[in-house]
Amino acid sequence: MYTLDFDAVIIGGGMTGLAMAGQLGGLGLKTAIVEKQIPEPYHPTQNFDLRVSALSPQSFKMLEKIGAWEHIENMRFCPYRQMRVWEMRGFGDVTFEAAKIGEPYLGYIVENRIVQLALLE
């Protein structure tokens, strides 16, 4: 009988599962990821995906620490300097601006699939 031995098994190879696997791997833990679908490979002429995430500076630091950010840089991303959030049927809204906190950017907009591909590297 063949036995597999892992310190951790992660169910789901989305951005969160893959980021966790990267962090656990950085701690020297042997990690398995269970996922039924691998993201479509990246090609620069592809249309942009509709599913994107606004990555905060902390997310950027984590991706940089586990070696994924350099792969994102080789694909595509876009820094954002301002973000407005509002209620669809309400009157509340808030605007965040990088310049008001003395930063060049608030974070980066990245297609979710590109984050996944970078984490798989």
Ranges and model annotations:
Residues 4-5, 78-121:
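Conserved N-terminal helical subregion
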Residues 4-33:
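N-terminal Rossmann-like FAD-binding beta1-loop-alpha1 element of flavoenzymes
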Residues 21, 60, 64, 120:
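Short glycine-/small-residue-rich flexible loop motifs, especially phosphate/cofactor-binding loops
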Residues 25-51:
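Glycine-rich FAD pyrophosphate-binding loop
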Residues 46-88:
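N-terminal FAD cofactor-binding segment of flavoenzymes
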